Amino acid sequence: ALPGAAGSAPLPGSMFNIWVALAAIWAAGVVVLLVRAAAGYCRLRRMVTLACKTPDGCYTCAAVATPFTLGVLRPRIYMPQSLQGSPRRAVLLHERTHIRRGDPITKPLYYLAACLHWWNPLAWLAFRQFEQYMELACDEAAIGTAPTAERADYCESILRFATVRQMPGALAFGQGQVAKRVAHLLKYRKPAPLLL
């Protein structure tokens, strides 16, 4: 044996300490992200406690600045009082599509997966891509075969609500890459039914 070789090998106790430290750092990161998301969700719940139900089945109050869907098991759609007419109908269809697709359940699950892998940038990239495609799918359902004028109104609504800050814990209408969403909507054509 070479002199000093025994002294250069890591001690079993020190390796254990490194793994414990890494596990503690990982757990702390997960806890911080989940507590932050839970706090945002609770803040939103408090904000809409005075919301009243509207004839179209949504909820509204003065504190609601942008359309969003909140809740996992019994999701509710919240709309600003100022949103009326054809843009409101399109936005409502967008939010109802989120509920029909199960997005209020799948988005928190994707977020949880990203939190568990918080140290990995690819996990966050995948989460952002999921959010983007989710919004595009709901946009497509909202405009369907709408004429150009209604499509322009809908795009204007996206731009209007994109300036409102992000709301963690909710499916907010203005989320996503705005320029990409608007460009996609302006080019979108509803696919023709497949003939067999």
Model-derived regions: residue spans:
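Membrane-embedded and juxtamembrane structural elements of multi-pass membrane proteins
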Residues: 1-196
